Amino acid sequence: MSLHGNPIVETAHLPDGRNARIRVGIAEDSYVADRDLNTVVLEVRVGHGVAAVIDTVLDADQVDAARHLATRVRDGLSSGELEPTTHALERLADSVL
């Protein structure tokens, strides 16, 4: 199994009552087929807006690490330890957990 066609998706309930959708998977590009991409991104959406999209150091085959990243982000956002911003999340995306 890989992240190609199988992104990791989590939902965080933010302290202010909003929900954040967390996705760790292959970057979505309408011009390039999923199988031709290997860039794994961390994407956080709050409401209908994109709060952060960050390239990670992960490969498509690192499903367990992607799941761990999504869980860490979910838990951090839910607790208020992390803000749903690129600045707050990029340190997690830059490491293999």
Spans of model-derived segments:
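Short aromatic-glycine-(Arg/Gly/Cys) micro-motifs in beta-strand/loop hairpins
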Residues: 31-54
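A short, exposed loop/beta-hairpin motif centered on an aromatic-Gly-Thr core
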Residues: 50-64
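Short, charged, intrinsically disordered terminal tails
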Residues: 2-10, 79-97
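Negatively charged, low-complexity tracts enriched in Asp/Glu with abundant Ser/Thr
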Residues: 1-28
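A short, charged, amphipathic alpha-helix used as a generic interaction element across diverse proteins
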Residues: 61-78
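Mixed-charge, low-complexity intrinsically disordered regions enriched for alternating acidic
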Residues: 23, 35-40, 61-66
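Hydrophobic beta-strand residues in large extracellular and virion-surface proteins
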Residues: 22-24, 40-44, 70-73
